[in-house]
Amino acid sequence: EDACTGRSHRSAPAKDKIQTAMNLAREILGLPDDYRIGIVPGSGTGAVEMAMWSMLGARGVELLAWEAFGKDWITDAVSQLKIDPVTHVAPYGQLPDLNAVNFNNDVIFTWNGTAAGVKVPNGDWIPDDRAGLTIADSTSACFAMDLPWQKLDVVTFSFQKSLGGEGGHGVLILSPRAVERLESYTPSWPIPKLFRLTSKGKLNEGIVGAATINTPSMLVVEDAIDALNWAKSIGGLPALIARSNASLDAVKSWVDKTPYFGFLAEDPATISNTGITLSITDPWFVALDDAAKKAVASRLEKALQKEGVALDAASYRDAPPGLRIWAGPTVEPSDVEALLPWLDWAYAEIRQAESAAA
C-alpha cells in the first residue's frame, strides 16, 4: 500500500525504497560491512559488463567457460575489449581444471551455469592472497548457494532468478579490492555512460547508494523488497538454500530410480540446485542422431507444457537435448516432487509412440 510508484526515482521516498532493497539484500546475503552493493541497468549481464569494461586491462585475464554464458564473457573480452585472455573451456556437463587457473591474473567465471546445470563446488580453489580480482557471475547462485565472500571481488546477480522477481535490473557487489582497482586504474578504451562506475577517479557513490546510474523501475524495486522480506520471514539465506536443496534432493531420488534420465553434470559435487538440468540416458535415445534427439526432447517439453505441469522446461538451445527444471528457492519443493511422475509419463508416451512408428 505504500508502493513508491508514479514518483521520480530521485525523490526521497524512492531513494529510501532503493536503499531498503539493497539493505535487505546485504543482510540476507551476509555481505561483509566493507563490501559495496548497488542496483545497475541491464540485469545480471549488465552488471558483469560494467565490471569487465571498467576493471579489465590492468593485468592479465583468465576466463572460465563450460556453457553459454561463460562463453559470452570470452567473446566480449576478445572481440569487444581486444584482450588476449587465457581461457579454460570445458564441454557441457563438465568443469575446466580449476587448479590450472593463475590468480595473478583477473579471473572471470560463472558460479552456477544454468545452461548446463553445472556449478563450481565451492571456493576452495580461489586463494585468499590472490593478486588479481575474481569476477563471479552469480546470477542464479545468489540466495540459493553459500558464496565465500572473502574469495570474491565482484559478484553480480539479478532479481528474476533466485528471488523470482522482475527483469531489467542487475545488482553489483564490490569488494574493497575491486573499489581500489576502480580508483587506481583507467582502461585504455572508451567506457559507455551506463558502464561508468567512477567519477573523477573515485567510485561513484550514487551507484552503490540509492542514486542509480539511470532510471530504475520502481515496480521492480517494490517487487524485490517484497521477495526479500519474504526471504527474511522464512529464515533468511539458510532457509532459501534449504528449499533449493530439497528440490534437488527430490530430483536426485527420482533419477536414482529412473533408467531413462540422468544429470547433465557429470560430477555430483557440481550439480546445480537451481537450474537442474537433465539429460536423457535411455540407450534408445542415445542411439538417435542429433536431429532426432532434439525432436524427441522438444516433444517431451511440449507434452509437459500442454498438461500444465511444467512450463519452458526445454534445455538451453546450445546444450545437449534434455530438460531443465527451475528449482530456485521461490519454487515449492513439493511442486518439483509432484512434477517427477509426469516426466515418467511423458517420456513413456513419447517413447511408445516413436517405437510404434518405427
Residue ranges: model-predicted function:
Residues G46, S54-V107:
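PLP-dependent aminotransferase-like
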Residues D2-M50, S54, A68, T75-D76, ...:
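Conserved N-terminal alpha-helix of the aminotransferase class I/II PLP-enzyme fold
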Residues W149-Q160, G170:
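Conserved active-site segment immediately N-terminal to the catalytic lysine
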Residues R317-A358:
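PLP-dependent enzyme catalytic core of the Aspartate aminotransferase-like
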Residues P91-F143, V154:
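Active-site phosphate-binding strand-loop segment of PLP-dependent enzymes
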Residues Q160-W254, D267:
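Active-site C-terminal subdomain of aminotransferase-like
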Residues G262-A303:
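Conserved PLP-binding catalytic core of the aspartate aminotransferase-like
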